[in-house]
Every structure is written in C-alpha cells, then in structure tokens.
Amino acid sequence: MLRMKLPPKSTHPSEPPPDAEEPEADARPGAKAPPRRRRDCRPPPPPPTGLPRGPPPPPPSPPRGLEPPVASGPTAGAGMPGGGGHAAALREQERVYEWFGLVLGSAQRLEFLCGLLDLCNPLELRFLGSCLEDLARKDYHYLRDSEAKANGLSDPGSLADFREPAVRSRLIVYLALLGSENREAAGRLHRLLPQVDAVLRSLRATRVEGSRGSVEDEPGGDDEQDAEKDGPGPEGGGCAKLGTGGGLGFRAQEELLLLFTMASLHPAFSFHQRVTLREHLERLRSALRVEPEDAEVEPSNFAGSRAQNDSACGDYIQSNETGLVEQAQIPQDGLTVAPHRAQREAVHIEKIMLKGVQRRRADKYWEYTFKVNWSDLSVTTVTKTHQELQEFLLKLPKEFSSESFDKTILKALNQGSLRREERRHPDLEPILRQLFSTSPQAFLQSHKVRSFFRSISSESQHSFNNLQSSLKTSKILEHLKEDSSEASSQEEDVLQHTIIHKKHAGKSPAGNVATSCALLEGLTMQYAEQNGVVDWRNQGCAAIQHSEHCVSSADQLSAEKRSLSSVNKKKGKPQVEKEKIKKTENRLSSRINGIRLSAPQHAHGSTVKDMNLDVGSGHDTCGETSSESYSSPSSPRHDGRESLESEEEKDRDTDSNSEDSGNPSSARFAGHGSVTQTVSVQPPADTVSLGTENGNLLEAPLTSHKYPHIPFMPTLPCVMHNGAQKSEVVIPSPKSADGKAVGVLVPNPVAISTMMESTNAAPVGILGPAASGESEKHLELLASPLPIPSPFLPHSSAPALQLTLQSLKLQPPQGASENCPVNIPQQAATRLSIGSPNTALIPVHNPGAFPGSPVAATDPITKSASQVVGLNQMVPQIEGNTGTVPQPNNVKVVLPAAGLSAAQPPASYTFPGSPLAASVLPTQNSTVLNTATSAQPASTGISPAQSTVPPAVPTHTPGPAPSPSPALTHSTAQSDSTSYISAVGNTNANSTIVPPQPLGPCGSCGRRCSCGTNGNLQLNSYYYPNPMPGPMYRLPSFFTLPSICNGSYLNQAHQSNGNQLPFFLPQTPYANGLVHDPVMGSQASYGMQQMAGFGRLYPVYPAPNVVANTSGSGPKKNGSVSCYNCGVSGHYAQDCKQSSMEANQQGTYRLRYAPPLPPSNDTLDSAD
C-alpha cells in the first residue's frame, strides 16, 4: 500500500519524488502530461521509464502498460540498467504501481480494483477484508456522521443539480459509505443520481463554448477552479483551465464518471439498476472520448498495446496528481484534431435493413425494427417508434443525406400515421425496406445516424452491453442465420414477430408459425428468462368438420407474452365488453409444453365452451418451461392469418386475460403429473383426432364400425394421468345441452386403446355423442391410480342416494384390444359424487404388471398391460320415497385403477354377493348414503388359485366434515346430525330395497377372513389411504395378514343397530415393527369405534405386530422393541432420552488443509 503511494522514492532514491499535488511540479514531467489525459481504452505510456532519465522524453521503447510481468520481464530487463529476471519483474511491478497511482483516475482505479477482487479466491478476499477493516478503522470516527446520513432513512435534501460541486461531492460520499445490503437507501440514491441525458447536454455545451471562446481565459478558469476546489473526493484542487462557466470542466467530468462507476459497481443496487447505470456510464464514456482534450497523444506510442486493455480498463482520465500539470500543456490547435481522428477511428454503420413494421397497441402509430450491420462485424437490432424515426429524419443535417432520400422517406413515414384504407400505397413495409437498404454512404457513416441507432431510450433497444434476453437471442440467431437468408425471408419475419419486436403494453403480437417449430429452436434460452405462455388459436376449427383444417389451426403459435413492470399494465375494458368476452370465449392457458389447461387448475369439471379440436404436442412448443406458465395468465389468442388491421380485436383478446384467470367456467383438470397432449371431442362432429408427440394426427370418423353409438350414453371424455411411463391423452370435456361438463379421468394403468382399435366388437362407452333426451346432466367417472386429497372432488349436497352396482366384472386382456363398457341408463341424468380419492371401491393391485410396461412415447394409442374396470350398470336411487326427494346434480364415482397380472387366465371374475359398504360423504343437509350390490351367493367367491383380487373394499372418506371428531357416529338418520354409513342388504333387479342381511360369515371384523366359510380368500391387497398425494406406488405385502377376530377388542360391538362396520388392519409403512402401539387398543374390552382415515390430514397407522389375546385383555407387543433414534432396545423413540437425529445435522462445508488421517471422521466426499 505504501509503495503504491510512493513508487519513485523506493525505486530511484536519487530522483526527487514527483509530488503531483504541488503546483511547482508542472514543468518537471515535461511530455508526460499528454498520456495522462487519455480517455479512451488504450494503455498509456509507461510513466516510470521517463522519471529516472530526466525531463526529456524517453527513447522509443515498447510501452508496458498493464502487461503481465512474466511475459514482458525479460524484454524490459534487457533494456534497463542492471537488467535481469528478478529486477525486471520488480521494475514491472513498480511501473504498475505508478500507472495505477499517477495515470488512472478515481473511477478507473475503483473499476480496476473491483476487477482484481473478482480474480481473488475467497480466502484472499477474507484476508483483504481484514486489511481493509484495519485501514478503514482509522477514519471511522471522522466518517461516522456521514455514514449515518448515507444509510439513514432521512431525506438527504435537494441533490438535483449535478452541476454544483457540493451536490456531486455529497453523492460520492453517500455512495462510498453506503452499506452493501441497504437496498432502501440505495433506491433513494438511485433516484438522486443525475440523468445521463442532461449530463450529455452539458458536455455538448462545454464543447461548443470551448470551441468559440479562449481556453486560456483566466477569469472563467479561476471561477471554475474555485468552484471545483469545493468538490469532494481524494483530489484536492481540480483543473481549472478547460471548463467554462456554463459547462463541465475536467474535475466535474471525472466526478461524474466516478459517480456512475461507483453506482454501477455497488452491491447495494439491484441487478437491473446496475445494468442501467453501466449503460449510462458507457454513454458518458463515449461522449468523453471525443472531447477535444485527447488530441495530442501520438498513436504510434501505443501501437503495440492498443488492443490489450480495450475492455478491461476504463477511460484514462487525469488524476489529482496530474490535474495541474496538464493545464499548461494543451495547445490551441488541439481542439480541431480530435473530432476528425475520432470520427475516422469510430465504428460506423455499413448497412441498415428494415426487419418489420408493427402497429403499437398504445396508439395508432407504428414501430420499426431495424437490423444494423456495423463495421466491426457486429449485428444489432433496434426498435424505433414512428415518432422517433420521423423526428430523427427531420433533424438530420443536409450534408448527411440527399434531398430525394429525405423526401421519399418522410413521405412514406407520413403515411404510417394514416389508416390502411387511407394510404396510397398498398403496403408500407416494402417501401421503407427498400429505402433503408439503398441508403447513401454519407447517411450511414454520419455521427448522428450512428448515435441514433446506438442510443438507449425507453422506446428503443440496443444490444451493446445489453443483458435483455430477447436481444441476446436475436443477436445469436442473426449470426447463425446471416449466411442463409435475407431480411425479407419468412424465417426472419417469424423471428421478428416472436423475439425482436418490443412489447410496449405487455402484449404480444402474433407470429404465424405455419411451417414447423424447428425454425424456432434457438428460442429455448429466451423462454427460460421471460414469463410468457404459448397459446393456440382455435377459431379456425370452430365450424369445420374436416380434420385437415384443424391440423393447420393447431400449428399457429403466437409470440411469447413478456411480463413487464406495473407501469405498463394493460388498461381495463368497459364492463360490457368484458361480459361479452366472458360469454363468447373461454380460453385455456398453456401449462407445460403447450398443454391446454385452465388458469385456475382445479380438479372438478365444469362448463366448457371450447368446442374446437386442439392438438398440443409436447415437444413442438420449443422449450416452454413449467415455471413460466405457472405464474402467467392466459395468453391472448392471435390468428396468424389475420392482417395488421385486426390489432383492435387482438387488444380485446389480450385485455381479457385477467378475467379468465378467475373464471370458474373453465374446464379444470388436475393430476399428479404433467399432461402432454390435448384432444377435445365435439359431440355433434364426426371427427376425432388424437395427437402424437411428433405433432401427427390420427383421424378416424366416429360413425364407422369402430365407434358404434350408444343411444343412452352421453359423451364422456377421458383424461390420462401421468402415473406411468406412457404418453398421456387429455380430452377436455365437451359442452352438453345446457353447458354441464362431462369428464372421465382415466389414469395410466387403464388403457384407452379401444378408441382406435376395432378388433373387438364390444361397444366402447368412452366416446360417442349423446342421443338421450335427459342427458343434460351427465355422470362423471373419475379413476385415479392412487388416492388423492379429497377436497379436489365435489361432494353431493342433495338427499341420500343408493347406488346399485350390478355385476362388477374384471376383464383381462383378450386379443389385441381392451374394452371399457360404461353403460349409463337414462335415469342417471345427474352427476353422481360417490366416494373420494380415499374411497377404495375396487382396489385391484397387480404385483407383476403394475404400473405397466413402458412403451413408446410417440404412440398415445398403445395398449398398456393393465386392466379395465367396467361398470355395466350404475343406477342412482333414492332411499325411501323416491318421488319426493330431488336428485343431486353432482355425483361422482372414484375408481382407483389398477391392473391384473398378465399371468392370470382370461376369464371373467365375479365378485361375491356380500353387501358392499360405501363411503361417507358429509353433505350440507347430513344425508345418508346407502350402497348395496346385487344379490349373489356367497360361495361364488374368488379362489386364491384364480386371482388375488378381493371384493370391493369399503373405506371411509371424511371430506370436509363439520364434525371435529374423525370417528363416525352410528345412530339413526332421524336423530343424527352428521353423516354416517348404513350398510344395507341386497337389491333385486327392479331396484327395490330388500331387508338387510347379515354381513357375512365374520360379522365382527367385516373382513372375509379365514374364520368363516370364505377361508380360501387371501387378503393381501388391502391398503390404507396414501397420506402423501402424488404418483407413488406401493407393492402389496409379501405375507397375508392373520385373522384378528378371535379374542381381541375388535369383537366388542357397541353399535346400536347391531351391525358393526368393517375394520381392516392396513399395511404398515415400516416393515420392522417400529410403530408405536395404539393407545385405545391397549385397554381391555374396549369396542374400538371405526374412524375415517384422514389420510390427507395426518397418517393413521395402527401397530403392525398386534397379536390376538385369548384372555381379551388387549393386544400385545410381539418381540422386543427398539428405538430408531439411538438404536437401543427396550423403549420407543418417543421415550428416548437422547437428542433427536435431526438436531445433530451439521453443515457440509469443511476446510481441509491436509489429507485427513485414516481414522478421521471427515465426511467430505472425494470431490472436495
């Protein structure tokens, strides 16, 4: 640190120290002053080489600048007295010190130091932090008050006029003392920073006044010097000779550079603020590079190291040590040399191409997007508004463009403000493209044109040092495509509409991607950075009965919708238009990879008004991620075949996004995973198309022999869950007669390959138009592979129903097709809502084939190895007086789908005729749900040799019950206010209720165990409801559960009606018996009340090792117990005295100074 301050004294003791702060040191350095005035990114000449050799300029030797000491050491040492490798390295180090302390200004020193800090490792940074703390502690008390003001919440006062030195000094002090995490104070200082446009105007005023007046004007210089001496910073008195009274002097320019440099590097500012400040700093540096003060530096002195530090170092402005030295060294003719040289060396424009014209949504004017080719082989894309372009051409000097060019351009631009029917020319875009492509060289190489197409404003874009993802993507794509197409090609037009064009009101123009999505493969990186959704235009298939028209409609992909700030929010439409849009359109947003789902993704079905056939391909949307569409509203619909005059209609489409996000009339389908394809079937139409992963369509008419009509069957769409490794198909619900939605959720184990296969002549009840007169309310069947939380299903709010399940059958695969007959009579003109995700009516689990073998993902029609559970007849009936109680309007049946083993014989199994206890659905009026099966002999049970499929297992579904107790009371319907279950007897064919029959051979537990006549029935497929919803699979237990009916507390029936509900011991989540004993089960002679499984609230797992006790004293523990916390036997984890395992978790970062010893307990992996 000390050597950096006094490098000449330590290196050359015989030479007097060049104290730059003394005014008498002006004449000593001689020719060293011009290099210190450098403001471009070129290394200055080495100042220490001239110091030991006296006042004359040094002989021409290669300048060192910031060259690495290792590379330039031998060369430097050869020409120096006492040269050598070590001495040369020392001298190079001293040259760096002197260059840093004497040549660089404050802004460049800070930027250089921050660049060096980025090259240090963390331990070096901590060491440097300690050194900085020690150095900063010396001035802590002096700067304490200023630091409190900088980080406080009080208003710093009026700091608007940046021309005042006191204002600039206070801003610099506040930025220097601002804490690294004080975002609030940083935002306040960001608002107080000067506007870069005002600074540039002041610089231009300084340049104009300096060219007219005398630079050596003593009165003005003295005033400027007196004003600048009051400024802050480490500098003492600023320079005085070059500034004028109305402009900005050297000291003010350096302070402004320091101000913007500190703000752009300060960690307290946000990323967006720092990027914006960096752009302002670059504009300020560009303006200072063409200042007249850098005219005298010979270009030959820097030929060797011109391109080395072009981007690393900043503008080399004179520091405080050299400010007074340079005042007497500037000649008079230096003011006219610099502009020509800067103009000669500047990068100019080689070609301007008009990419596209788009009407703005905020007003009726147009936007123009230009592709600019620069002389340094860079390509930028700039979007200018109609007003900006017109004002620029009107203010253009005469010498830069021809008169005919101006007249033609302005004539075309004036037509841009007119409507299309009022224009004389049919299209404006070809005219402007031709005019800009044939621009004269004087127009292209002028400074005003270059600054116009390089400027950064609120209405334009710029790609130099611009971190916007759209422009980065545009620049990358232009480099990839510059040898393949012209600006008027279709691919660039698509890229123009999808990427380059800037959205001013948060709305996206339409892009017609009719060829394929392959030409948008480069947009993948853009979608990850912008919030947007992909929408599908559906109006083209509204009234078309042919599927080939729908193929072109499905390929219309609109541009992404960029999420802008709250300033650019959309203006609301009148209420009349909003209501009209609500009634006419109900759009579905994209969720993952172009899949159409509603914005509020609920699980219950409702009215669907979208009757179009839309096919969304999983990989054709070019990289849309799930994080975009989760936080984005529904995107507007844009028809690619529409012209530019339909922007007003697109405005109305876009402004209705916020209403659709909360629209309850959207079709809602939710599953455990993503859905990759969408197929909507329209009942009146005769065409169905199933989309594959590749975007292909498989068409087949519904009127053929493959799809025989079922006269009483309403159209039921199917929804495939992502439960297995197979491509899924989603069919949104079509609209019925009165708008009621019909939906069938079919998980992956249930195959729907019968929709496209015709080898079996059995009727398929999934597809087919409804011909019944009473089909305004349909039955919704929901089959889920695993239990899901019950609030996702609506429950019935009507009086009690009795569901008759006749001849439940399971059919294994036969031949090449599978059948899913769902026959619904005309009496079932309601929505049944029976059961919930916890309800296990027909649990069929397959140890061998579950969840199905993976098939090709591109074929959604491929069969799975699982089975189809068919309901031949489902008749909802009313208990008691059937004519007086209204039917419910929302009834569902939940069937957990599963498959049978492939090794099972192809025979139909019939369930035994024992009554079926159903699930409880708590309703608002506390009704009773009675469920029964058809009467069949009990001896027709399934033998173990045939199948392991048990009969329908009743479990309990609590739902959002008003009662806080999970247990269900068992009283009569007249005296009980909560929902309960009454298991009734069988019903005959005409659905009349017969008296209740006994519950089977084992009436105490309800299980068809080995204590009765059904001893052959093995029970290894009963499961408790899954406490964690999601695509999880559990295999059945390897051992069958023993009977617990003899002598346990389960045989203590205490229900009032004599019928005891079934109780089942589910599979334990732990196989080693580490679950605690039940509390109530330990009490002797206690009749345990059957409780509903609140799987969605908390898991209820009874003890797995409960053994029957003949004395009736309760269950016993089988074997010794152990604690999983400490591993010691004899107690459970809840009684463990040791600390919990979770409390001992430590961090993973370790400092390793040497290899650990062999018995070390270091847990780091080999990578560390």
Swiss-Prot record:
One GO MF term: nucleic acid binding
Start-end of Basic and acidic residues biased regions: 574-588, 636-655
Record keywords: Metal-binding, Zinc, Zinc-finger
Positions of CCHC-type zinc fingers: 1121-1138
Residue spans of biased composition, Polar residues class: 932-949, 966-978
Pro residues: compositionally biased ranges: 43-66, 951-965
InterPro entries the record matches: PX_dom_sf, ZCCHC2, Znf_CCHC, Znf_CCHC_sf
Region (Disordered): 1-87, 209-242, 561-693, 932-978
Keyword Iron-sulfur: no
Biased composition (Acidic residues): 216-227
Biased composition range(s): Low complexity: 67-78, 626-635
Amino acid composition bias (Gly residues), ranges on this chain: 233-242
Domain of life: Eukaryota
Protein name stated in the entry: Zinc finger CCHC domain-containing protein 2
